[in-house]
């Protein structure tokens, strides 16, 4: 994933955390975790706060990494933490998704989100959420969760909201594959693909959730001038530029060719489409 912080771009692969200069894209430094037995299973997601990068790892470990030096300063091995995924920060608390474990070669999906107090870097509590929690996002002091719950095949992945101001109450919102947020609005794509037919058939549904009014609007946030192929092309990314509200949607043709990026104004008016230069676009960061 990509993260913009301290006027730099932070990028993680499974084994490394890299930092790049914002303008030229020239790599400044990188940190490798392959020789650390606690972290060698792989970095999964990153978030930033107060000069530190917080990273989740397979194996149930969270690391506190100095954002300037990329040195690991603290590690927290979470009891009953297995393959950690998404992370998000709200009110000096780190929320960490605990997705699955393997037992006798079989996948066992979990339903935990861990809450880590960043002041003490200790586990504060464990929340019960939808099965296989994967993506976490903070907006307006709320935590939004997409859980890859495969029991909802026809409906899609489960979308929930965690409210730190209300004792971390967990509430179901609906279903979504991708989410992004700006100006009190969470933009959602529910991308459903039928893999049982050849070629596979995808159907995309675009909607929004108003954080202030706690309202899910099932009407599309795209205007009628949106390219028609967006309704049926597999999506791989949804991002919003918080400087101007522009919405970016990435699509993928998998191994068949390069993906595309579709750009829209905040009001859903189509602006442009361009080749992303590779397969499966999945992240974007924005600079003034």
Task: Locate the predicted segments by residue.
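Predominantly soluble domains enriched in secretory-pathway, periplasmic, or organellar proteins
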Residues: 1-288
